[in-house]
Amino acid sequence: MPADDYPVTELTKALIARPSVTPLDEGCQTLMAERLSAIGFNIEPMVFEDTTNMWARRGNEGPVFCFAGHTDVVPTGDVSRWHTPPFVPTIIDGYLYGRGAADMKGSLAAMVIATERFVAKHPDHNGSIAFLITSDEEGPFINGTTRVIDTLEARNEKITWALVGEPSSTLKLGDVVKNGRRGSLTGNLTVKGIQGHVAYPHLADNPIHKAAPFLAELSQMHWDNGNEFFPPTSFQIANINGGTGASNVIPGALDVMFNFRYSTEVTADILIERVETLLKAHELDYDISWIFNGLPFLTGDGPLLDATRIAIRQVTGYETDPQTTGGTSDGRFIAPTGAKVLELGPVNATIHKVNECVKVDDLEQLALCYEVILEQLLC
């Protein structure tokens, strides 16, 4: 069968054609639900505010294997820079182009196709298969996976293993899987001063001048050494804003946004304590608020990682490399429940970019990998 005609290719194209920019779903989950319902899944839509979510499950017993992912995509950017319209899926030289091709409608299609094949071969499989799908992963992530997990936890419905379809691969399909993620902590700091005329600095109090030594010291601090699974904790200033835009006005306040990506060697509480101790040492007048974006998690050796290694080796012929690098994913909301979480998806070279694309052959291989993982865990 030509790669263009693979069922996974056709389903990916159907999903790409739905312009589901966050928090819109545009019928993607309905399309998936129709396919899953036909093979015995119970479909439970969960709509919270502007976000569409779906919890689908086949089986009533444990262990529970869950495919997790998102139907929403980031905006297209300048459409004139695309080779083809971003929501008109187009195959050129073996690559399928379209917004969401790699992140992550190709993965969603591969999950559905793999599950259809697995159920056809193993209708009486062990345990349960589930899908946790949201339309709010690329956005504020308030009403998506975290709300679904809250609902499941309230009724004591547990996930044993979760496979997130984020584009984990770097150079070729399956060369990297993500078996953990760093924690993410954001600080929003306001340093207070007194606004005034630049010609009369004795009548004002410049918060930029006051904050500069603090920020310099903060940016040079050593937080930890990392460990065998995580790099050292990193600190980055993301935004600074102060002043009125006029050259003759000393600002009355300085706003600074910064972010930590932290390892399991520290906790959010430790980072907060160190920052606030330094603020007090510099005798700054300040307000600060914190946003907890996610705790660090790690899935070590065990059934899920073992099954994934076997699947990638069997389908591609090479060994995968588990890593914890990169940004956060919705896995951070699933892991605190006790579930083991891994991420396996397409090559991430074009995600969020103009002309996002995925290799058509990789979609079929990804579906095969997912199918082998199901066989390893539920047969």
UniProtKB/Swiss-Prot annotation:
Residues that bind Zn(2+) 1: 70, 103, 166
Details of cofactor binding: Binds 2 Zn(2+) or Co(2+) ions per subunit.
Active-site residues, Swiss-Prot/TrEMBL: 72, 137 (proton acceptor)
EC number: 3.5.1.18
Keywords: Amino-acid biosynthesis, Cobalt, Diaminopimelate biosynthesis, Hydrolase, Lysine biosynthesis, Metal-binding, Zinc
Record carries keyword Transcription regulation: no
Reaction equation(s) it catalyzes: N-succinyl-(2S,6S)-2,6-diaminopimelate + H2O = (2S,6S)-2,6-diaminopimelate + succinate
GO molecular function terms noted in the UniProt entry: acetylornithine deacetylase activity; cobalt ion binding; succinyl-diaminopimelate desuccinylase activity; zinc ion binding
PROSITE patterns xrefs: ARGE_DAPE_CPG2_2
Annotated positions binding Zn(2+) 2: 103, 138, 352
Single GO BP term: lysine biosynthetic process via diaminopimelate
CDD domains: M20_DapE_proteobac
Keyword presence, Heme: no
Pathway the protein acts in: Amino-acid biosynthesis; L-lysine biosynthesis via DAP pathway; LL-2,6-diaminopimelate from (S)-tetrahydrodipicolinate (succinylase route): step 3/3
Cofactors named for this entry: Zn(2+); Co(2+)
Subunit structure: Homodimer.
Function in brief: Catalyzes the hydrolysis of N-succinyl-L,L-diaminopimelic acid (SDAP), forming succinate and LL-2,6-diaminopimelate (DAP), an intermediate involved in the bacterial biosynthesis of lysine and meso-diaminopimelic acid, an essential component of bacterial cell walls.
Membership in a protein family: Belongs to the peptidase M20A family. DapE subfamily.
UniProt name for this protein: Succinyl-diaminopimelate desuccinylase
Organism, as annotated: Shewanella baltica (strain OS223)
